[in-house]
Amino acid sequence: MDRKTRGRASKVDLLPENVRKTLHEMLRDKAIPQARILEEINALIEDAGLPDEMKLSRSGLNRYATNVEQVGHNLRQMREMTSALTAELGDKPMGETTKLILEMARSQLFKAMMRQIENPESDVDIDLLKNAMLAAQRLESTAMSSHRREKEIRQAFAEEAANAVSEELRGQDGISEELEQRIRDVLLGKA
């Protein structure tokens, strides 16, 4: 079996950064056939003065391209799920800390998916993901409670102001009960 050995980097991982970057750009462009990618990358390897052993084989490039495509597919799925979650949350408040924790959980999920793709028999640290998501849920719940409490305080303050204005205006010449009620409604945000 041609399995990656633990701790051993692939040929692509050992390539210079500029060659790897070019490879990734070419793989993203679906119009470029793998045969041409192989030719150009091997030419870049040769131009860089690297030994012939560093050149990519057709099957090695295909394996790497398949891996990259699988990762891309998983990322697209994750983005769709994130978009759906964001749409579901709507305009509910979400603090920066919550966003950060969700991003960290997303990152950990991505890393776990990558490990699973590279080695299907490996264990995924579900506890870490579960704890991160639980922390995000608790943080979101706290943020919602805080938002609700802040709203209640604002409402109480508005009622207090409306009562004070109503008492001040009550009995004033030229102020009808209807006008007084309209002013009160404006202060309470009901107008």
Curated annotation (Swiss-Prot):
Q: What does the UniProt induction comment state?
A: Expressed in the late phase of the viral replicative cycle. Expression of late genes is activated by the viral late transcription activator C.
Supply the alphabetized keyword list: DNA-binding, Host cytoplasm, Late protein, Viral genome excision, Viral genome packaging, Viral release from host cell
Asked if the keyword DNA-binding belongs to this entry, the reply reads: yes
Assigned GO CC terms: host cell cytoplasm
Query: What subcellular compartments does it reside in?
Result: Host cytoplasm
Can you cite a GO biological process for this protein? provirus excision
- Spell out the disulfide connections: none
One Pfam family this chain carries? Answer: Phage_Mu_Gp27
Q: What is its main location?
A: host cell
The entry lists its GO molecular-function terms as: DNA binding
Task: Please give the family membership noted in the entry.
Answer: Belongs to the mulikevirus small terminase family.
Briefly state the protein's biological role: The terminase small subunit binds to the packaging initiation site (pac) and regulates the ATPase activity of the terminase large subunit. The terminase lies at a unique vertex of the procapsid and is composed of two subunits, a small terminase subunit involved in viral DNA recognition (packaging sequence), and a large terminase subunit possessing endonucleolytic and ATPase activities. Both terminase subunits heterooligomerize and are docked on the portal protein to form the packaging machine.
Q: What is known about its subunit structure?
A: Heterodimer with the terminase large subunit gp28; the active complex is probably heterooligomeric.
Q: What is this protein called?
A: Probable terminase, small subunit gp27
The record lists the organism as Escherichia phage Mu (Bacteriophage Mu)
